[in-house]
Amino acid sequence: DKVGKQARVLEDIGYDGLKSIETAHDPFMPLLVASQNTEKAELITGIAVAFARSPMIMANLGHDLNAAAKGRHVLGLGSQIRPHIQKRFSMPWSAPAARMREFILALRAIWANWYDDQPLEFLGKYYTHTLMTPFFAPTNNEYGAPKVHLAAVGPLMTEVAGEVADGLLVHGFTTEAYLRNVTLPALDRGLAHSGRTRADVEVSYPVFSIKGRDEKEIAAASKAMREQVAFYGSTPAYRPVLESIGVGEVQGELNALSKQGRWEAMGDVITADVLD
């Protein structure tokens, strides 16, 4: 009930998109509730962990939510990182960019079977889908497939977004320098692979921000932001983002603190210059 009320309020005050993340809870359930309490806002998973599920399961989830939302669902996917996929989800990890490309192509093949009566003959390196009988194929196909947006930080995954996705979800942990020098050129390379331009994709960039009504709130928000930046900065895959502003060396320090479980101490490593 709380989710439904909040969704209505956000739509009423002008938000045209509502996003649900996959952290402590499934990202689809809140959006299902929101779909029954809103009329216009896009409902976006931001993100759903692709490699924690098979393409068939994800195809079903995307279809069902898009049908419930009457065509307003955007299936935002992300890879997560190796430790979470292997140790938290107990799923295989390899060549994430290549695997994600195949994952999205598998989704397209499954949906083509459901919506366009195309034979399901997807034979890939990582995923194989060759069986679909009428009993298991959805029939409520009025709204078709959701748009697929892909979260990416590294250049290879960003190229995949440009090649096969409908949109790119830029990570909030992205500097202006990294966006201009790494992300957008990689997106353009991916678009070139598929003969598309930037006009053919949507790009979402949820920047980190610090705000408050007084100095006390600003101080609290700054502390929380330092801890959030430190959390992401501890991940080796995100070191190039820190290097883009000349502070790549702090990644090793943050990683060491994270392995010691010193999460709050990590925030002290992030200076005001880094936040700026």
Region locations from a protein language model:
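Active-site mouth loops of central-metabolism enzymes
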Residues: D1, A48-P55, E142-V153, S209-R213, ...
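N-terminal beta1-alpha1-beta2 module of alpha/beta enzyme domains
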Residues: D1-T45, F51, P146
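Acidic-and-aromatic substrate-binding clefts and catalytic sites of carbohydrate-active enzymes
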Residues: S20-M29, F51-M56, T175-L179, I210-G212
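Glycine- and other small-residue-rich loops at beta-strand/loop junctions that grip anionic moieties
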Residues: S20-T23, I47, S54, P96, ...
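Catalytic cores of alpha/beta
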Residues: P55-H63, G212-S222
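Internal, glycine-rich beta/alpha segment that forms the wall or movable "lid"
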Residues: A59-H63, A67-G167, G172-V201, G252-L254, ...
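Glycine-rich beta-alpha junction loops
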Residues: I81, T174, Y205-R213, E249
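Active-site pocket-lining/capping segments in soluble small-molecule metabolic enzymes
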Residues: E217-L275
